[in-house]
From Swiss-Prot:
SUPFAM superfamilies: SIS domain. D-glucose 6-phosphate binds at residues 159-160, 210-215, 354, 358, 389, 519. The modification N6-(2-hydroxyisobutyryl)lysine is found at residue 34. One of its GO terms (molecular function) is glucose-6-phosphate isomerase activity. GO terms for biological process: gluconeogenesis; glucose 6-phosphate metabolic process; glycolytic process. Its EC number is 5.3.1.9. Its main location: cytoplasm. The gene is GPI. This is Glucose-6-phosphate isomerase. Phosphorylation at Ser-185 by CK2 has been shown to decrease enzymatic activity and may contribute to secretion by a non-classical secretory pathway. ISGylated. It is found in: Cytoplasm; Secreted. The modification N6-succinyllysine is found at residue 454. The active site is at 358 (proton donor), 389, 519.
């Protein structure tokens, strides 16, 4: 594929931006088109609620949207989409298919990898998960002293942690009959130590989530958990009742003491950051119940079908992707804020920080050449309204343009005080996108200060600080209620957005070589931290840091 910057459709878009980009003014666009909302919004109607994507508060015209859709066609988005769904090995650096869509393929149509339908294997693992969940949640599965399981501890890192953690937090209202869940990921001993102090070994079930069963952080934490458990249980055979594995390495799992019957498999065509739909989601299913886990899969499958079959100009993931391309590659925006107005979604931005940045944080194209344009943005965010009292100042009046996605459910899980809390939340959600779009003109600010009785001197002094330029772009994503189905649909929507952007940039969104170099160097440094001998084998900075750490290790601290 030709480089993006040499694509005639992209050059046409850039030319339009150079000639007209500075003239785009959201206030004027809304004044000129009273139907702008209808022209630039999309409603997705499912049997489990609706999703409204309002992208009218973006710096776009109908011409811009047409050019963006033409760019998607020119870059081969439709053909690439089919290649993914058909099980072709689009992860070309690792020679793997990319089939998280198969994990939630509720229509059960055949999906082939190397000529073999993967769906029987997918369904077999789902059936095994269902049976296991029913045994644990019903109390049929007992610990070594005969107690039922009250706590499930997922030990994993990256994709084996962020997805299940985000989902179990988001679906807390659906967990009333399930065990508590805990997530341990960090190699920092504080994480496992603090967690274990709150647990009873007799009623704890550990899930060790590691495809290879060799991930250093995960296996170190798992061994620490096993050591803690055996201090109480004494008998190593008791491990089988309290530890299960999400892995493909039967030998290592057996060596650890886990019964291979309690090993849940997944496949090399499941990328870590797309794995919550697989056996990696076992902690989700245990916490909220397998029926709700299936609803999560069904919501994602609904979005998969929408993404695969809907024309690009009405396709929610495609539109989100194209708007991102517009801001990153024409306006030069470097970050993207995800701002969910729902406390249950407090890990949503962190989840897609990995989903987006590990997928599209690349500078090498499929042909092995360096890109000459920007790729993946820095993704960040916090729940509303907390963020309003933290970083929105910079979004409103800072020197950087930060495109934002605002998300909110119409119905709350907690309509306390006759819905007062949620009404205030909704009002703030609506006010922020209007404020970012409209801003406040000099005349409006002056009238406001005059009405407040400010003296002419105070008025002139304060006036420039009270002006908001506005013209800050946002998407509003409003959905009926945060149910398992709806969460599945929202997550899949953003997954496909990331995929589309990767295709347009001609990068591989499904490998992560960038995490390897640091791990290699850490293995070399680890033995150098032993003893007190000065280290001189690195650059001056790294040597200095190692030697300072060695010197301070035994220092007495008051």
């Amino acid at each position: 594929m030709a480089a993006l910057t040499r694509d005639p459709q992209f050059q046409k878009l850039q030319q339009w931006y150079r000639e007209h980009g500075s003239e785009l003014n959201l206030r004027r666009l809304f004044d000129a088109d009273k139907d702008r909302f209808n022209h630039f919004s999309l409603t997705l109607n499912t049997n489990h609620g609706h999703i409204l994507l309002d992208y009218s508060k973006n710096l776009v015209t109908e011409d811009v949207m047409r050019m963006l859709v033409d760019l998607a066609k020119s870059r081969g988005v439709e053909a690439a989409r089919e290649r993914m769904f058909n099980g072709e090995k689009i992860n070309y650096t690792e020679g793997r298919a990319v089939l998280h869509v198969a994990l939630r393929n509720r229509s059960n149509t055949p999906i082939l990898v190397d000529g073999k339908d993967v769906m029987p294997e997918v369904n077999k693992v789902l059936d095994k998960m269902k049976s296991f969940c029913q045994r644990v949640r019903s109390g049929d599965w007992k610990g070594y002293t005969g107690k039922t399981i009250t706590d499930v501890i997922n030990i994993g890192i990256g994709g084996s942690d962020l997805g299940p953690l985000m989902v179990t937090e988001a679906l807390k209202p659906y967990s009333s009959e399930g065990p508590r869940v805990w997530y341990v990921s960090n190699i920092d001993g504080t994480h496992i130590a603090k967690t274990l102090t709150q647990l009873n070994p007799e009623s704890s079930l550990f899930i060790i989530a590691s495809k290879t069963f060799t991930t250093q952080e995960t296996i170190t934490n798992a061994e620490t958990a096993k050591e803690w458990f055996l201090q109480a249980a004494k008998d190593p055979s008791a491990v089988a009742k309290h530890f299960v594995a999400l892995s493909t390495n039967t030998t290592k799992v057996k060596e650890f003491g886990i019964d291979p019957q309690n090993m849940f498999e997944f496949w090399d065509w499941v990328g870590g950051r797309y794995s919550l739909w697989s056996a990696i989601g076992l902690s989700i299913a245990l916490h909220v119940g397998f029926d709700n886990f299936e609803q999560l899969l069904s919501g994602a499958h609904w979005m998969d079908q929408h993404f695969r079959t809907t024309p690009l100009e009405k396709n929610a993931p495609v539109l989100l992707a194209l708007l991102g391309i517009w801001y990153i590659n024409c306006f030069g925006c470097e970050t993207h804020a995800m701002l969910p107005y729902d406390q249950y979604l407090h890990r949503f931005a962190a989840y897609f920080q990995q989903g987006d940045m590990e997928s599209n944080g690349k500078y090498i194209t499929k042909s092995g050449t360096r890109v000459d344009h920007q790729t993946g943005p820095i993704v960040w965010g916090e729940p509303g309204t907390n963020g309003q009292h933290a970083f929105y100042q910079l979004i409103h009046q800072g020197t950087k343009m930060i495109p934002c996605d605002f998300l909110i459910p119409v119905q709350t899980q907690h309509p306390i005080r006759k819905g007062l809390h949620h009404k205030i939340l909704l009002a703030n959600f609506l006010a922020q996108t209007e404020a970012l779009m409209r801003g406040k003109s000099t005349d409006e600010a002056r009238k406001e200060l005059q009405a407040a009785g400010k003296s002419p001197e105070d008025l002139e002094r304060l006036l420039p600080h009270k002006v908001f330029e506005g013209n800050r772009p946002t998407n509003s994503i409003v959905f009926t209620k945060l149910t398992p189905f709806m969460l599945g649909a929202l997550v899949a929507m953003y997954e496909h957005k990331i995929f589309v952007q990767g295709i347009i940039w001609d990068i591989n969104s499904f490998d992560q070589w960038g995490v390897e170099l640091g791990k290699q160097l850490a293995k070399k440094i680890e033995p150098e931290l032993d003893g007190s001998a000065q280290v001189t084998s690195h650059d001056a900075s790294t040597n200095g840091l190692i030697n300072f750490i060695k010197q301070q290790r035994e220092a007495r601290v008051q």
